[in-house]
């Protein structure tokens, strides 16, 4: 019932619902005393669990866990499982500068994109993917969801399906981006045929759409080949540079 509420009332993505489920499952196993029922849950029980997780997680990650708990406890009260409001959990604060900066230096990102040999295996593809992430802030999940018909050439618009927010985004495309997309399609993508509607395909057999995890791999590969020093090789830093 709780998962259904997260989907139907809050519209959360599958990934977000899975994170909620992991927190709730762990709380029910480690947050409750043996044979304790949810109806007997107390604030000290919740505080002990949060203290336990605080020894395992960063404050940033703990914020998400506390948010999941609040949501679940509100649901339990609405359903009559618990009588008292127990969702007033203090959220751990994070401070500016506590986490590494998310954005990369613009000059380094530009150097990375320029360094890609488009004549190498999947060179046009990788150049196009990284260009879209840097200039339009696309997530890996949004990149792999793009199709050949996601591009409206006449209107110069890219249709992006946002998996995280379950919404559609229509992005105006700059002339440079249109040229990069057209070059990729003409010189590399169309050679793979029309069996798959996805815009970006695997470079090796078996033929098929590229997977989300592969976006991170190609980013690390291109950084390594470029010989550029970047503070961390997390591909999500590209979209935060946007």
Predicted feature descriptions by range:
Residues 1-242:
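Conserved catalytic core of the tyrosine transesterase superfamily
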């Amino acid at each position: 019932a709780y998962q259904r509420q997260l989907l139907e009332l809050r519209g959360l993505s599958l990934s977000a619902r899975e994170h909620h489920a992991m927190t709730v499952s762990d709380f029910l196993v480690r947050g409750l005393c043996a044979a304790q029922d949810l109806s007997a849950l107390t604030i000290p029980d919740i505080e002990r669990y949060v203290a336990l997780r605080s020894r395992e997680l960063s404050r940033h990650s703990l914020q998400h866990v506390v948010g999941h708990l609040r949501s679940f406890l509100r649901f339990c009260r609405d359903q009559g499982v618990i009588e008292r409001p127990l969702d007033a959990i203090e959220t751990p604060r994070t401070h500016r500068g506590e986490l590494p900066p998310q954005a990369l230096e613009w000059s380094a990102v530009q150097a990375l994109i320029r360094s890609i040999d488009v004549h190498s295996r999947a060179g046009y593809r990788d150049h196009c993917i990284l260009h879209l992430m840097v200039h339009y802030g696309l997530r890996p999940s949004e990149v792999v969801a793009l199709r050949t018909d996601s591009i409206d050439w006449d209107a110069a618009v890219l249709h992006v399906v946002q998996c995280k927010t379950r919404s559609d985004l229509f992005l105006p495309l700059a002339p440079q981006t249109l040229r990069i997309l057209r070059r990729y399609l003409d010189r590399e993508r169309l050679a793979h045929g029309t069996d798959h509607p996805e815009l970006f395909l695997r470079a090796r057999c078996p033929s098929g759409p590229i997977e989300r995890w592969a976006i991170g791999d190609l980013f690390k590969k291109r950084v390594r080949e470029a010989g550029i020093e970047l503070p961390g090789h997390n591909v999500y830093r590209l979209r935060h540079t946007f």
